[in-house]
Curated annotation (Swiss-Prot):
NCBIfam families: IscS (TIGR02006), PRK02948.1 (NF002806), PRK14012.1 (NF010611)
Native organism: Rickettsia peacockii (strain Rustic)
Protein name, per record: Cysteine desulfurase IscS
One Pfam match: Aminotran_5
Reactions the enzyme catalyzes: (sulfur carrier)-H + L-cysteine = (sulfur carrier)-SH + L-alanine
Active site, per annotation: 334
Keyword Cell inner membrane attached: no
UniProt subunit comment: Homodimer. Forms a heterotetramer with IscU, interacts with other sulfur acceptors.
Enzyme class (EC, first level): transferase
Job of this protein: Master enzyme that delivers sulfur to a number of partners involved in Fe-S cluster assembly, tRNA modification or cofactor biosynthesis. Catalyzes the removal of elemental sulfur atoms from cysteine to produce alanine. Functions as a sulfur delivery protein for Fe-S cluster synthesis onto IscU, an Fe-S scaffold assembly protein, as well as other S acceptor proteins.
Residues that hold [2Fe-2S] cluster according to the record: 334
Length: 410
């Protein structure tokens, strides 16, 4: 049983970039498809199959509507990791006899970077674009990196670690002018910020259900039909999903993703106001009470549900232990098992000592003002205690530049 404090249930969930709780309305929509409406959506000879197929197609149209796509352009997958792999490897395999170059960014999600490294072993040339100190790519650098051999540019919309929003419209315009396919991992932005695949000239986009208050184990890949984009499938079988992703579709999960998309479509403005208000309250109150706290990533060009903060003079892991009443992360959930400082922060040029102090706080639909105030009070009290114990903080206060110290190795 979770302890309660003035109607506040502890621990407080603040890791919305790792996953989100299922919205009760999503759960309600899914339940019948686990029980009475259990048909296979590919069974065309009876009403159980028709009922499931109708539910799948309705969900498909809900997902498409949220990004301005055509219903037929949505391919269901197991999640954004599979979608990213299908997009990047699928394009590379289909077009490798014509072109052999892909461009991505050093701060992409690990599954994009690993898919690209896999392709490098198969002879595809990969360019990893740097990011500026604010976490955003430089558009001129992108333009200059595109050659006549470039088949794909892959840039995520919202970074999972630092929350910065890349200029997708400008990137899409460059790609279209140069005749290069544009893929975006939109898992952290789908349903949270306005995304229009046509206005942004996006050719492929990866979507995840559990980042928008839907179930885990379901995602989608948007694949443009006009001009047509071709991908070689990763999974062979019955030819479902326009031949791009074989396997029986999990109707309950798809219904959940569809309902989550429908809610996001109708409530995006309300959610955005809520998240922006709590972000400003959290950050302003932290800055009023503690010195040398740094927001990682551009303050304005970002999704404000993500607060990645560095607390100078405090080790991030010790901070997480000290604030165990808050469920937070010191990196992306896929890489936070490692004690290495975040590769995203390091690629922004942030020094190792500050990168090690970074903690990501996630704010979402179900975060309350009371939870944010409790979090701020807890953080401030623990920071003061940890800094009082920290020889590094003492040295910094004495004006010693930690970058210039040569540490002895025992």
């Amino acid at each position: 049983m979770n302890p309660q404090l003035n109607n506040l249930t502890l621990p407080i969930y603040m890791d919305y970039q790792a996953t989100t709780p299922i919205d009760p309305r999503v759960m309600e929509a899914m339940l019948p498809y686990f029980t009475t409406k259990f048909g296979n959506p590919h069974s065309r000879s009876h009403s159980f199959g028709w009922e499931a197929e109708n539910a799948v197609e309705e969900a498909r149209s809900m997902v498409a509507k949220l990004i301005g796509a055509d219903t037929k352009e949505i391919i269901f997958t197991s999640g954004a990791t599979e979608s990213n792999n299908l997009a990047i490897k699928g394009i590379a395999k289909f077009y490798s006899n014509k072109k052999n170059h892909i461009i991505t960014v050093v701060s992409e999600h690990k599954c994009v970077l690993d898919a690209c490294r896999h392709l490098e072993q198969e002879g595809i040339k990969i360019t990893y674009l740097p990011i500026k100190p604010n976490g955003i790519i430089d558009l001129e650098t992108l333009k200059n990196a595109i050659t006549d051999q470039t088949m794909l540019v892959s840039v995520m919309v919202v970074n999972n670690e630092i929350g910065v929003v890349q200029p997708l419209k400008e990137i899409g315009k460059i790609c279209r002018e140069k005749g290069v396919f544009f893929h975006s991992d939109i898992a952290q932005g789908f349903g949270k910020i306005p995304i229009d695949v046509n206005a942004f000239n996006i050719d492929l986009a990866s979507i995840s259900g559990h980042k928008i208050y839907g179930p885990k184990g379901i995602g989608a890949l948007y694949v443009r039909k006009k001009p047509r984009v071709r991908v070689t499938p990763l999974i062979n079988g019955g030819g479902q999903e326009r031949g791009m992703r074989s396997g029986t579709l999990p109707t309950p999960l798809i219904v959940g993703l569809g309902m989550a998309a429908e809610i996001a479509y109708s409530e995006m403005e309300k959610d955005t106001k809520h998240v922006n208000y709590l972000f400003d309250r959290f950050l302003n109150n932290i800055h009023k009470r503690i010195s040398e706290v740094y927001l990682n990533g551009d303050k304005n060009q970002r999704y404000k549900g993500n607060l990645n903060l560095s607390f100078a003079g405090v080790e991030g892991e010790s901070m997480i232990l000290a604030i165990k009443d808050l469920a937070v992360s010191s990196g992306s959930a896929c890489t936070s098992a490692s004690l290495e400082p975040s590769y995203v922060l390091r690629s922004m040029g942030i020094g190792e000592e500050l990168a090690h102090t970074a903690i990501r706080f996630g704010i979402g639909r179900f975060t309350t003002e009371q939870e944010v105030d409790y979090a701020v009070n807890l953080i401030c009290s623990k920071i003061d205690k940890l800094r009082a114990l920290s020889p590094l903080w003492e040295m910094m206060q004495e004006g010693i530049d930690l970058k210039k110290i040569k540490w002895a190795v025992h």
